[in-house]
Amino acid sequence: MERIERRLTVPAELAGRRLDQAAALLLPEFSRSRLKTWIDAGRLTLGGQSARARTRLAGGEELALVTELEAAIEVAPEPIPLVVVHEDSALLVIDKPVGLVVHPGAGNRSGTLQNALLHRYPELATLPRAGLVHRLDKDTSGLLLVARTLASQKTLAAALERRHIKRTYQAICQGRLTGGGSIDAPIGRHPRERTRMGVVDGGREARTRYRVLERFRAHTLCEIELETGRTHQIRVHMAHIRAPLVGDPVYGGRPRLPPRPSDELRSALQGFRRQALHAVRLGLEHPTSGEALQFTSALAPDLRALLDVLRADAKAAR
């Protein structure tokens, strides 16, 4: 555990504010929920005395924080290989392989990206979700952003909420799309199948943009940008326009084959067992320096192999 001692004087401009509100402004490196916990436990005091979170301030009081920064998560470190695209004192960019679960959960407390991060970067144990700013599904490959400090995590989470972080994907879709477009359709839990998401009335706002990169006889390679970040958003939205991702076990349906497909193409499509989706680019402003950053990731080997088969089939059919 890390010991923390901070002493601050409440500035006059915060007069009239609640203690918890002022603490969030004066100690932005800590989350509001954590500050509230410390106030309730008497670790964040006002004028040397415990106080309630709703106490109104007059200005000029002394705030004192004396506590231990306990681990935010109880996940065991594990020596799982990581591909680190970028590393500095504020953030990491990880290239996640297919099949790696991001967050521990029921049935998979080990073998996740969080376990790997905690082994290589033990200090992340003090951060919510080990610093992860967003997530990818288990069988989606590509770039993930991780904060290394609580201040960076809060800044990056706010940037994500304001849509200042640009996330770009490539996907192999079923069907032959004629052009790009934008999908604006709310996403929520499927009304009957609770493990699925769907486009539903009253769902959360969700917007996706896509453009065609390459067409094949019965499939399309698309570049996709998220404007929002709902669960399974790309998979749900592309299925909604009848262009589900190849291999998607939940939203994909049966493989679509062109007329007279080669045995190689039939085998490749029927054997592709995960959604054909890869996070290829990540663009953001550095949380401390403000520098514009952009990171790229090459398509995963299984996607490259499938594209080779699709191209060969299209060429042979000319």
For the regions a protein language model found, what residue spans apply to each?
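RNA pseudouridine synthases
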Residues: 1-318
